[in-house]
């Protein structure tokens, strides 16, 4: 694209790299701090051992027993359990788009604790019974909370479900402990408050096996988690196999929680506090948040446990009580709505001019008039029929407008065209092949769906939001390349949004958000663009500029465009063809002059309309008459 389009692209690229360097610095500092805390913790306890002796290896036999037999296993448990809980919290928060979704609040820790108590009371003779039953309890709690809380995609409902399940499981734990003898009751009570003093080699092995598996699995899915933070609807449209990612992350986070709780007891709030502090320091990218959370969680629990065993030595404090003293105030802070996270800086470059995207960056893969997407006699419905025998073909280089009243099935038709829904009969064909044969990533490489912007629960800049559109076109878990950033900046400029690049998405107006959503779709570099009410919340000037951009994309870059609108005159002005949808059936399809007649439009909208023609362009101009059709 010509350099005049974005005068601040160098600034934005530098800002993106600065963010990565900042995050890398955070991880390096945490790693160094963890090493220092590890060494210092070895020296602290009821019997002090000098650091010089530890580092030089000049230890007495008694000191070797203390270091290697008592302190080192405990320190390893603290590091492993802290890393596990922090990563589980980061994963739950990203997946569920809820900053309060840590294993404790969600009831996952309670499920793990209940399973562990069952293991302590009834299967203590089996060394792995406690971790395995703990994992089963965590998984069951996660599954039930998800089923109860995810309906309607309401974060408050999810938290409420977690509180209910946690309370229920807590009651079951109380009932079980009444059956325990005095010795088991004492052990269970102290363990529930966080106990790292009794970990066996089997428990340590299980914990670090879980941490290793969890780290690799969560990091491998970290790019998908970035998209899940914008909402499952958007993530699915951008190429994420949301069902697969959801269950992988759920199972992994449950494994991490179970491993930590079964080996170290109920150490609370680590999964809540640590990810937030990490995001505050390094941003919201889960490729950085997950490893940084592991180091920070390990550091927090190690420091808490060191304090627990040294503050009133030789007596000990429960480690979980110390982490709760840190976590509870943070939870109150979040509930009061004070959390804002790291906000993007205001962009310094000038306002974009809305020019079309560079041909050098948008390599057209089709020729004008080529049939791209074919809705072949599709019907769809649930308890009642929504669409019936729809036949519609979208060709490269054309703009098709879909008109109809509310409830006619327009959005359902778009979701079928995007592969989000499967028809009850008929087929959606992409260049002659059934769309169901393609993966979500393959579909997102060809088809972009633009819906209304969803509310975000984590601070993302507009540039970060648009970069999510590059998911389908890039492989692996690497960071955004200079080309990805350049394409994102160009799509922001094309939608007249470059001045928003470093602003928080949630700080934008509804119309500004809608333009950024379109920029994200363009960053997918699709061949088909499906737009659901693209001009909603836009002022008149931006309605025209956006649809002019859409027309240019079709005519200059051979995209196929299908857009839903209630703006009849905008459809007449910008569409090459118009489809009229009434009660789930297409009643007319053709160029605007053929379709946009007074009779057809009046029948469609059940309102008397008049059609005139522009004296220069000859395009239809629709006005409303008084009175309704009887």
Label the predicted regions:
Residues 2-344:
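Alpha-helical transmembrane segments in inner-membrane proteins
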Residues 403-405:
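The feature captures the beta-strand-to-loop junction immediately N-terminal to the Walker
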Residues 418:
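Helix-to-loop junction immediately C-terminal to a conserved catalytic motif
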Residues 426-434, 443:
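Conserved ABC transporter NBD signature motif
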Residues 478, 504-508, 512:
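Conserved ABC ATPase signature
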Residues 525:
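Conserved catalytic motifs of ABC-family nucleotide-binding domains
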Residues 529-533:
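Catalytic Walker B motif of ABC-type/P-loop ATPase nucleotide-binding domains
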């Amino acid at each position: 694209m010509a350099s005049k389009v974005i005068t601040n692209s160098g600034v934005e690229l530098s800002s993106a790299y600065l963010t990565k360097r900042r995050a890398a610095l955070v991880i390096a500092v945490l790693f160094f701090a963890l090493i220092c805390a590890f060494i210092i913790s070895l020296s602290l306890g009821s019997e002090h051992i000098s650091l010089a002796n530890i580092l030089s290896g000049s230890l007495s036999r008694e000191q070797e027993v203390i270091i290697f037999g008592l302190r080192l296993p405990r320190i390893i448990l603290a590091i492993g359990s802290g890393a596990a809980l922090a990563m589980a919290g980061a994963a739950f928060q990203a997946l569920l788009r809820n900053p309060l979704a840590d294993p404790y609040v969600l009831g996952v820790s309670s499920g793990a604790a209940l399973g562990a108590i069952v293991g302590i009371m009834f299967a203590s003779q089996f060394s792995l019974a406690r971790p395995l039953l703990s994992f089963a309890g965590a998984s069951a709690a996660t599954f039930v909370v998800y089923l109860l809380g995810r309906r309607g995609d309401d974060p408050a409902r999810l938290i409420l479900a977690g509180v209910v399940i946690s309370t229920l499981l807590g009651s079951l734990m109380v009932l079980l402990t009444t059956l325990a003898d005095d010795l088991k009751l004492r052990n269970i009570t102290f363990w529930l408050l966080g106990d790292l003093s009794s970990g066996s080699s089997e428990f340590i092995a299980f914990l670090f096996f879980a941490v290793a598996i969890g780290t690799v699995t969560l990091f491998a899915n970290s790019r998908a988690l970035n998209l899940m933070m914008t909402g499952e609807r958007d993530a699915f449209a951008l190429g994420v196999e949301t069902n697969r990612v959801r269950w992988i992350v759920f199972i992994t986070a449950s494994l991490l929680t179970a491993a930590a709780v079964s080996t170290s007891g109920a150490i609370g709030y680590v999964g809540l506090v640590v990810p937030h502090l990490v995001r505050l320091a390094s941003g919201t990218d889960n490729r950085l948040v997950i490893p940084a959370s592991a180091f920070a969680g390990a550091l927090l629990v190690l420091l808490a446990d060191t304090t627990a065993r040294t503050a009133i030595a030789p007596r000990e404090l429960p480690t979980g009580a110390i982490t709760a003293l840190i976590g509870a105030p943070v939870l109150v802070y979040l509930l009061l709505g004070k959390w804002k996270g790291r906000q993007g800086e205001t962009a310094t470059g000038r306002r974009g001019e809305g020019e079309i995207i560079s041909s050098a960056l948008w390599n057209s893969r089709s020729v004008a008039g080529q049939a791209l997407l074919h809705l072949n006699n599709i019907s769809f419905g649930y308890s009642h029929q929504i669409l019936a025998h729809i036949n519609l073909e979208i060709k490269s280089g054309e703009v098709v407008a879909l008109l109809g009243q509310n409830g006619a099935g327009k959005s359902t038709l778009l979701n079928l065209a995007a592969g989000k829904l499967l028809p009850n009969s008929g087929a959606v064909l992409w260049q002659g092949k059934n769309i169901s044969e393609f993966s979500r990533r393959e579909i997102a490489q060809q088809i972009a769906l633009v819906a209304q912007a969803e509310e975000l629960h984590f601070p993302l800049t507009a540039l970060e939001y648009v970069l999510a559109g590059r998911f389908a076109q890039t492989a692996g878990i690497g960071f955004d390349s200079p080309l990805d950033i350049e394409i994102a900046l160009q799509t922001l400029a094309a939608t007249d949004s470059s001045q928003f690049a470093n602003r928080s998405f949630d700080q934008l107006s509804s119309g500004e958000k809608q333009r950024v959503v379109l920029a994200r779709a363009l960053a997918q570099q699709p061949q088909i663009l499906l737009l659901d009410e693209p001009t909603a919340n836009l002022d008149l000037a931006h309605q025209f500029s956006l649809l002019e951009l859409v027309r240019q994309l079709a005519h200059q870059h051979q995209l196929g465009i299908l857009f839903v609108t209630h703006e009849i005159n905008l459809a007449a002005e910008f569409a090459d063809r118009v489809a009229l949808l009434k009660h789930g059936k297409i009643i007319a399809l053709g160029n605007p002059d053929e379709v946009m007649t007074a009779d057809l439009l009046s029948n469609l909208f059940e309102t008397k309309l008049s059609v005139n023609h522009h004296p220069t362009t000859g395009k239809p101009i629709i006005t409303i008459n008084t009175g309704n059709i009887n």
